Amino acid sequence: MNLKNIESTHVLQHDQSDCGVACLLSIIKFHKGDSSLEKLRELSGTTQQGTTLLGLYQVANQLGFIAEGFQTNIRTLAEFEQPSIIHVTLENQLQHYLVCYHYDNEKGFLIGDPAKGVYYLSASELNQVWVSKKCLTLEPNVKFEKSATSKNNKKKWFVDLIKQDYKLLWISVLLGVVIACLGMAMSIFSQKLIDDILPSHKITKLVSGIGLLTILLLARVGISVLREYFLLQQTKDFNNRINNQFFSSLLHLPKSFFDTRKIGELVARLNDTQRIQSVIKLLTSSLVIDVLVSIISLVFLFGYSWKVGLISLLSLPIYFYIIYRSNKKIIQSQTEVMQSYAFNEGNYINTIQGISTIKNDNKQAVFKNLNQTVFGIFQEKIFNLGKINIQLSWQSGLASVFFLIGVLVYTSIQVFNKEIKLGELMAILGIVSSLLPSIANLALISIPINEAKIAFNRMYEFASMEKEPEGGQTIFEIQSITVQDLSFRFAGRKELFKNINLNIERGKLVAIVGESGSGKSTLGQILQRFYSFESGSIKVNNEYELNDIELKSFRNLIGVVPQEINIFNGTVIDNILLGDSVTPETIMEFITQYGFLDYFNQLPQGLGTIVGEEGINLSGGQKQIIALARVLYKQPQFLILDEATSAMDRNTEKFSMELLEKIKPKCAIFFISHRLNTLKNIADEIYVLENKTITHYGNHEQLIQTSNFYSEYWKE
């Protein structure tokens, strides 16, 4: 196997949970295929805890591999001819995945580590961490796609983003050409001043020369300011455009996508737009000027002294190489900084969201130490990057000194030998002094480009993911929902439930009960089309398959009160309307008609009370009342209530139950509850979810006649 090919196709993980899919993506790229971490995360069922070997097996088969799982030994692993994924246990019992490419009799096993890179491990070293002896072999079959389609799509996506900026960017480039040419004015004038003007003692020539130089330098300043303004305008437009497009893509991704992502990482990737724009500005400003300065400087050096020009031309590649050879280390260090930054952001958010638990359990010291560790790792990555930059600075600085001294010594000898004049020496030194920074910038240009490339890939992974479907049959009413032989599992996980059958009709309240974790809420989310089921069918009005209905028209007809209520920054009215424009009379009529007014009048400013992060703290019951008002204002024809009254007091719950009885003739209601005592008088049918399937169903009187989860509650 070609080591360079392996190193070039190896993929580093974006966070700790990515190690499994990063290994799979490395093997895909090794075989000249293409995919993305986000797509593999979704298909494999990767969660914040990571990926199962089953999940990797399932997605590998989907992507055109012959995948086989084994529990084997080191000797057999050494005989594998194709790269395989192995499950290892690192220090502190941390579960991890590695790619084993092949075995070399002298060097050992060639390992691709998504956390560190490519390296060799001896058989004993690998055996020490490979505790489970589990591995997944992967061999591409005829269905495996080898194409550069993804690269073309990335290019098209990026070009579409900057297409509107072409005019401003080209103007900036042309102005950069003028600025680069004017940059030589001082060196040329210095040479003329020393060699011609001052020796001739011609005041008129001196004044006119200084006047011309002043005009050129002022023109350079003016053009630079104008150019910066154009780039500033482009920066604003581009950042708005890419942020809007990326955020819009994010909002239209399937709900399952957000289940496997930390908020801090999503925020960090939204901020990646700044890195991309910085590089665009760099390419259209500094890069253009540096290239032109380098070319023009070399031309002038050859003009003053072809020997000095030749020495510079031969020496600069060495100077360039000294800087360029550090690129790989810098790029790897930059990647680690970005990963640790995202992890640190996530830790902040996670800690702040759990502040009540932390305080109640007196765990401030624990989380303080955790933050210190996470932030310390982040700072350590920044420190390591800084050390590389310092090392690069002194190496390039040393090379610059030797090069400048060499040119100074050689040109001084030329002056002694009267090969060049003193003014020409001064001009040469001035040109060389401006040439070296430009060469250094060109040598380092790949670093910000690769940083932006990493940021771009991180953004494109989200932007290119398959959005929720848009087409389908438009419906205008929901009379019934019929679930037949429904089975479901999360990707890479065991079957959650199987052969579920139930019927929900308008005019009835259908409840489902079962142990925690049995899949009741997941079933509710399947009915919302947040997840795709494995087998079976869900029919609407006994006519349309749920997945064949246009998603927007379906969700316009349903309403949901979830377990976790989201209260947005704004007033109570804002949280009910969610952007709808209505007259005050209309909303007051709704609030009064449904009986919510007394509850909202208890708040400090009534319906105008500011709630959310910037407002008052609401109790769980108050949040549920707002959520109930929000969903009923929508006038749904299919209502899903997931523990919708769990935080309410007795009177508020009684009010909610009476409200459901009132609206029941107009819609079908699916009620998920652990509070079984509330179902006795309100539920028309109750389904019992036990042992991964529906074991019993009927009304209260029917269910208590048999032995089941529901009847056991009433017998206690």
Residue ranges and their predicted role:
Residues 1-186, 199, 203-208, 231, ...:
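Membrane-integrated ABC transporters
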Residues 170-223, 230, 302-307, 419-422:
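Transmembrane helix-loop-helix hairpins at lipid-water interfaces of multipass membrane proteins
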Residues 211-220, 224, 286-335, 407-420, ...:
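Transmembrane helices of ABC transporter permease
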Residues 244, 248-265, 336-386, 390, ...:
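Loop segments that connect adjacent transmembrane helices in multi-pass transporters
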Residues 340, 344, 359-363, 387, ...:
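Cytosolic ends of transmembrane helices, especially the final helix of ABC transmembrane type-1 domains
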Residues 522, 559, 564, 572-575, ...:
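ABC-family ATPase nucleotide-binding domain "signature/switch" substructure
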Residues 528:
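Helix-to-loop junction immediately C-terminal to a conserved catalytic motif
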Residues 548, 555, 573-613, 666:
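ABC ATPase nucleotide-binding domain helical subdomain, centered on the C-loop/LSGGQ "ABC signature"
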